[in-house]
Amino acid sequence: MNKIILTSISIIFACNSILGQTTDEKYSEDVKSVDAIIKAYYDVNSGSSSDPWEFERDTYTHSKNAHIILLDENGKAELVKLEVLQNEFRMSERKDSYEKELKRKVSQFGNIVQVWSAYEIRYEPETSTNIRGLVSIQLHYEKGRWWIDSWTNQMESDTNFLVSDFLKEK
């Protein structure tokens, strides 16, 4: 009987320590460095159809008023709020999708960082595709952590070879 009570108490404490974590405790490693926050940026959008979306983690990496700009194949820009983008994902069926970074260029001056990152979208983790995009991510460092302030994304198309051109650059 005592073993059952002790085991039950141990399980309750374990659940409380895991479920009771603050977002700072859960995701603090994601924002300690530029590499870590870019890894988290891709991780939150990658996973199998059975994996839950990581909206809390995604929100944690972005500053409160982050700007997201999506460019269509003609270069027309659409400004989207993070919450709106997340709601669109919530409303659609999750599919196996893995964003794989292909190349990155980073420029830093003080607490400001500009990241250029080419990536491809895969439907199986180890199988390459021709679905590729280029994203420009702006970060700042404040209060001991990195924040994503904005990002602009454009997908490669039959008429726009931006990823191919970016991959050729030294």
Q: Predicted segment positions?
A:
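Bacterial Sec-dependent N-terminal signal peptides
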Residues: 1-25
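Short, low-complexity N-terminal intrinsically disordered segments enriched in polar/charged residues
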Residues: 19-55, 60, 168-170
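Surface-exposed, charged secondary-structure patches
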Residues: 30, 68, 76-125
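Hydrophobic pocket/interface hotspot
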Residues: 41, 56-58, 66, 115, ...
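Short beta-strand segments enriched in hydrophobic/aromatic residues
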Residues: 45, 62, 119-121, 152-153
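N-terminal, post-signal-peptide region of Sec/Tat-exported proteins
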Residues: 49-77
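A short, polar/proline- and glycine-enriched secondary-structure boundary/capping micro-motif
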Residues: 79-81, 126-129, 157-165
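Short beta-strand edge/turn micro-motifs at domain boundaries
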Residues: 132-162
